Amino acid sequence: MDKLLIRGGRSLKGEVLISGAKNATLPELCACLLTSAPVTLTNVPRLQDVATMLKLIRNMGVAAERSDDGRVTVDASALSSPEAPYELVKTMRASVLALGPLLTRFGEATVSLPGGCAIGSRPVDQHIKGLTAMGAEIVVEHGYMIAKLPKGWTRLKGARIATDMVTVTGTENFLMAATLAEGVTILENAAQEPEITDLAEMLIKMGANIEGHGSSRIRIQGVESLHGCTHQVVADRIETGTFMCAVAATGGDVLLKHGRIDHLEAVVEKLRDAGATVARVEGGIRVQSQGRLKSQSFRTTEYPGFPTDMQAQFMALNCISHGTAVVTETIFENRFMHVNEMVRLGANIQIDSKVAVVEGVEKLSGATVMATDLRASASLVIAGLVADGETVVERIYHLDRGYDQMEAKLRGLGADIERIK
């Protein structure tokens, strides 16, 4: 099993190209199932989750071709199976995104309950609630969600959907299903993430009638059919934020090409308060940092607040900053699993339920640590970059699920990092 060997102590300098967003690519691949015409996505990252999704839709009879330049062309004209089996999706939470498109295209769908990171229950009940409001009949049995249209129905029907909580994948599922539903669908309490806006813009290119995306209230007027399009996947804001924290922690100077400050304002504000320089420049974002920064307390919330997917990486920065930081996780339970591994590197962190208190230390020391989930693995890489001596990060298959060639990009910025067996 692959590991990362990191020899810490080097500043990061240079330029790095930010890849397309995993959390936009996955729903957009599912959106390709809504039409029998070819759809081309560009700027598609090379990630394990993307490979899994491509394998899944190919298993349904879809033709999906990938080129070396980040282009994927999907032709779902021969879509033949409405099933997403457990064997294919057990490692990936995003499998639930196939439910809405398959139900819309086939009138039925059988989708395995999702896998992915073990960072909380992330229930599917909101998906079921929303699609049921549109008329779907759904049961959960033997580990599968089995959905169908009522007898005599040919389409879902528009509805007002108000979820009990903000749900990103739920909003995406309802958005895709509503494009071809009969009548108007109103999504209240909708998630506002840039990846949802990007999905909506792709669907509009395909002929959908959508208003209000990027706000908490989205209106979709169903249409008879969708057509193909070419769409560039938005840059990955979490990869952008991860590299920002790595540069800030190591005392570097890096241009993040294609990075967008407007998608990361809560993180940028905290980095500036900590003492880093973050500037919008032509072609991306420039991050500069010198010396030890000031610890920053923060609370994770839904977008546009501080993203839960950046909590672990910013905690790594807090570990070696001046002062004490209080980190409150409000989105997922079990999202402090990286803390014990950081403590192995010399960090001073105390946990009480959903709150972590981080007392900054002058230095970390290299050790062998184990990645427990996707963002935890990135945080351990950042900690390893600043630790004295050698750090080995095990179980980096988590990292490969969500970061496109991370060690190669870091090496290009001057880090001493290599993949080993």
From Swiss-Prot:
GO terms for molecular function: UDP-N-acetylglucosamine 1-carboxyvinyltransferase activity. It catalyses: phosphoenolpyruvate + UDP-N-acetyl-alpha-D-glucosamine = UDP-N-acetyl-3-O-(1-carboxyvinyl)-alpha-D-glucosamine + phosphate. This is UDP-N-acetylglucosamine 1-carboxyvinyltransferase. The active site is at residue 117. The modification 2-(S-cysteinyl)pyruvic acid O-phosphothioketal is found at residue 117. It is found in: Cytoplasm. Its EC number is 2.5.1.7. One of its GO terms (biological process) is UDP-N-acetylgalactosamine biosynthetic process. The keyword Chloroplast does not apply. UDP-N-acetyl-alpha-D-glucosamine binds at residues 93, 122-126, 309, 331. The lineage of its organism: Bacteria, Pseudomonadati, Pseudomonadota, Betaproteobacteria, Burkholderiales. Phosphoenolpyruvate binds at residues 22-23. Pathway: Cell wall biogenesis; peptidoglycan biosynthesis.
